[in-house]
């Protein structure tokens, strides 16, 4: 089904919303200085994906309880749960805005204050907060596949730049220790913490009881892309440089190009994909904040 009816979204739209909202934050923030790098990251990612598959099943079973938190958990506890999730949304949104504030002046538009960029970003994203889940689903239906396909093409174009000596350098088996695997495992779980918001979304999904495979499929897709990046980044840039770069995907984008150097600034296209995903993620957080306020009886959400 391409578009769901009755103000609900289809499983395909759910899948593409998850891809759109999480892809850019993952690509930009997980790797590099203080992040998850090396062969131990691959092992940690695989283990985290297995646990997340079971976690999704639990979240879907909890969906009816999240439809009205006050009714399900009582007035005090229900509102406390709502405040907890609302704080998460605020902190995550602030982090993404800070990321946007840094990336746009550094990579796309020079001479413009990052504060103004963050301000207009939040204004633009807030306009869609009350448009309903189905409109967000249709937006993801149209653009989600393009974004995913574009990122896959970007990775494919970067493969010829890989160097065998860099790749062998990244395969430092002496770093595959229990501690490093635990750190990578924990880091991936933290990165996927936004999955905890699924119960606030599933109520608007057609036949949400059978949407577990779809949500797990989106997580698996993102996980496979992460594993690909964990192997590609050190093979192209070198393991030592990866550990020194705050956002190693940016120099990776600089080197991505079509054969024959068809476009002089091909990296701008890829940066545009990531920027669009970041804006969708911020808009998603605003939408979930509105849902949390309403379902936890914290207000009407009109001022959100």
Where are each of the predicted segments found?
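Short, Lys/Arg-rich, polar N-terminal cytosolic tail immediately upstream
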Residues: 1-11
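Helix-loop-helix connectors at the membrane interface of multi-pass transporters/channels
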Residues: 97-115, 203-225, 284-304
